[in-house]
Amino acid sequence: MTRMGSFFAGAIPALLMMSSACAIELDPKIVGFKLPADIKWTENTRSGNRTAVLQGDPTKPGPYAVLLTWLPGNMSRPHFHPNDRFFMVLSGTWWVGNGGKFDPEATVPMPAGTHVIHWAKGVHYDGAKTEPATILVWGEGPATSTPFVAAENMEKK
């Protein structure tokens, strides 16, 4: 082993030990974070999709951020929200359609890396087809969803 190689062979473990011994704690009043192990996922028993609230409470007024994993074959039916909602597709392909007629074949693929906005009161539907899709959702709560009932369906009731 060369002299330089010997130096680095001894220096690297020492540097690693020093870095773990000098771990810096972040002030939670300045920087908030959740490590992957700290993110609590829950399963929606109705749809089977998984959600994890990252920030805020989407059922209350104020900002929120939620992770949502759509499972293959799950699609919402036409609905709308009272507030704008913002999305970033993190993995998989999320399929999005608009209008009051549910037609999964008329959806458009949104691959990972795509940013999407659902404008307030815009009727849409979305979900996953053959692979899971994980998206980050954020907006101003309360985040409610109202099923869309087409005018012709309301007249029949």
Language-model segments: which ranges?
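A short, N-terminal "cap"/entry segment at the start of jelly-roll beta-barrel domains
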Residues: 22-64, 150-157
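Conserved short histidine dyad/triad with adjacent acidic residue
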Residues: 61-81, 110, 119-121
